[in-house]
Amino acid sequence: MKKLLLISAATLIVSNSTFAGGILTNTNQHAAFLRMLSRGATTEIDGALSNPAGLAFLPKDGFHVGLSIQSAYQTRNIDASFMTYNGVSATGPTVADKPFEKYYEEPAAAPVIPSLFAAYKKGEWTISGFFAITAGGGKASFDDGLPMFDASAMAGIFQEGLKAEKPTVITPDMYDITSAMDGKQYIYSLQLGLSYKATEWLSVFGGGRMNYFTGGYKGFLNAIVKGTDTNLLPLALDCDQTGWGLTPVIGVNAKLGKLNIGAKYEFKTNLNIENNTKNIEYPRTPEGEAMIAPYKHGVNTPNDIPAMLSIAAAYEFLPVLRASVEYHFYDDKNAGMANGKQKYLTKGTNEYLAGIEFDVTKQLTLSCGGQITDYGLSDNYQSDTSFSCDSYSLGVGAKIKMNKHLNLNVGYMWTNYEDYTKKSTNYNGTGLPGTNVYSRTNKVFGLSADYSF
């Protein structure tokens, strides 16, 4: 039926969050985070992001800068199994004895992720800022398409064959489907703010962050009848998207002897992205026009950055031994997403972090840490083009004091994701049962240089 063909078309014209891999805010902007994970109570230069109020307690007046380079490598995988039609009986279409099975793997690589931090301290006042890619999924490719492409196309082609002037049974073994999707998504952020040391133990921060979104995707689907040039379902998409939004940020830091407590709140960012659609090919029907209307050139789609709360505490047990614990809450459920997708979340995202560092010598510090991420996922939220998985991360690394002005940080973070299984009795609108198992991998390496003068 035409609806299934239109579903296939719409799956190519995916939402703006496709290649972000679901709910994503990049907190790993500095190698110090990778090596320890809990940095929400730091008073070092990476605090420009993680604890800006804490920069009022920088050890000396003057300029403090940090440059970080990271390399991130991910895969997003879908193990799909779904039924297909294979013929017609007196009672209607018949279903194949065995499901169609295929493993879809999407590599995503960001070999160079730069971040720049800076602060100037003078007495009780500190002005600070940073530039970084604070959200987005980098670049990604599904070279073999997606299950939703294949399932909708197979069912749609079968139904259309039966409705032809001369009804024909067209089964998946009679044609070859080729499909692919390439995408990119980045949110570049520039933050500026001011910290004030109100008392010997208390400081506050206020500032703002400008966010610029840039992304795009290209995709196609062809279903060529074997031995011919006949294309049963030509689909194509070439679209870029841009947008911007402002994030107010406030923070507070309390330094109580060996205990330091840092807190930060980032308000929700209202962000709309605008389509710059260069090419769309789809079935030219009234239904098709209605379905692709939100994705035409010039149309805006919500892509809010959720409000975020961070609370952390660090304690110096010994002059050479320090530890930190931290909590993050992302209010994803109240952040606008394409098609109101946020309403399918059961809750916001909770993160629990902890880290420890030990000074082996005056020049060398070793550290490690862990993070647990708990999303409020549901079957209606998860899709082939945008899915998340609960996870835990481990980080390890070192800090090297080169001299009294220069410190180097090196860190490695590995994330283990919990598979998410989604079963459906109406797989991608085909009317047939199917199952997807979503999984991910993630590895990040980083090197940072911090300089004070």
What are the functions of these language-model segments?
Residues 12-13, 61, 360:
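Alpha-helical transmembrane segments and their juxtamembrane interfaces
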Residues 21-38, 42-43, 113-115, 119-453:
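Outer-membrane beta-barrel porins/channels
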Residues 11-12, 89-92, 253-256:
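Short stretches within intrinsically disordered, low-complexity N-terminal or propeptide regions
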Residues 16-133, 387:
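N-terminal, post-signal peptide beta-strand-biased segments of exported outer-membrane/organellar beta-barrel
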Residues 1-20:
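Gram-negative bacterial Sec-dependent N-terminal signal peptides
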Residues 10, 69-71, 412-414:
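A broadly conserved detector of short glycine/acidic/proline-rich loop/turn motifs that flank catalytic sites
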Residues 2, 86, 428-432:
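Low-complexity, polar-biased intrinsically disordered regions enriched in Pro/Ser/Thr/Gly
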